[in-house]
């Protein structure tokens, strides 16, 4: 059997599991959302022209009803800050509520979590790769690919099929996340 989701925004597509009632209610709300119109970029997060251009281009791409995008930037050009600004713009425009940040190494996960927490202090964060107590209701989740694979394969499903509105994959070229 196969499960497909038809949300009225994007073409129908296969999904791995059924969406929860909360996921479906959020989808219904999203049907009436408008384009991303408030492209105000916080200069304290990103202030370089090429970073702002990247954020604007991604928002225009999403407004054109594309579900996926790829941002390729050289080392040291502020990819994490661009991701933070993008999350900021998308949350202010009510396009995303829950974000998953994936990376191939724990050090990248830790660094991203620290930067997001510092630059978006009003958003709750949780690092799933770390030990200790976890806030599974946090709006920003951070983990390695392998940690998320373990959560997907676990008997006790922590995350529904529609839990994350935005998934950011750092170092995608190294990704083993082929599901």
Predicted region positions:
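ATP-dependent helicase/translocase motor core
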Residues: 1-98, 107, 111-123, 136-140, ...
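Short C-terminal domain-edge/linker segments immediately following a structured domain
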Residues: 22-28, 131-133, 171-176
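Conserved residues at beta->alpha junctions
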Residues: 74, 103, 171
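A short hydrophobic beta-strand->loop->alpha-helix junction that borders the nucleotide-binding pocket
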Residues: 102-106, 129-131
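Signature of the SF2 helicase/ATPase Hel1-core->accessory helical subdomain module
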Residues: 149-154, 160-179
């Amino acid at each position: 059997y196969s499960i497909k989701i038809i949300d009225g925004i994007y073409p129908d597509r296969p999904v791995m599991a059924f969406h929860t009632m909360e996921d479906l209610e959020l989808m219904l709300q999203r049907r009436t959302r408008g384009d991303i119109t408030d492209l105000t970029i916080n200069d304290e997060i990103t202030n370089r022209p090429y970073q702002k251009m990247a954020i604007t281009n991604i928002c225009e791409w999403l407004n054109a009803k594309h579900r996926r995008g790829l941002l390729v930037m050289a080392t040291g050009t502020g990819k994490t800050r661009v991701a933070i600004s993008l999350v900021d713009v998308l949350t202010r425009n009510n396009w995303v509520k829950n974000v998953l940040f994936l990376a191939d190494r724990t050090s990248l996960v830790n660094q991203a979590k620290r930067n997001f927490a510092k630059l978006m202090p009003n958003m709750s964060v949780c690092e799933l790769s770390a030990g200790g107590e976890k806030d599974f209701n946090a709006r920003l989740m951070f983990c390695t690919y392998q940690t998320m694979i373990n959560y997907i394969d676990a008997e006790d499903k922590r995350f529904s099929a529609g839990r994350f509105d935005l998934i950011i994959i750092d170092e995608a070229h190294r990704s083993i996340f082929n599901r």
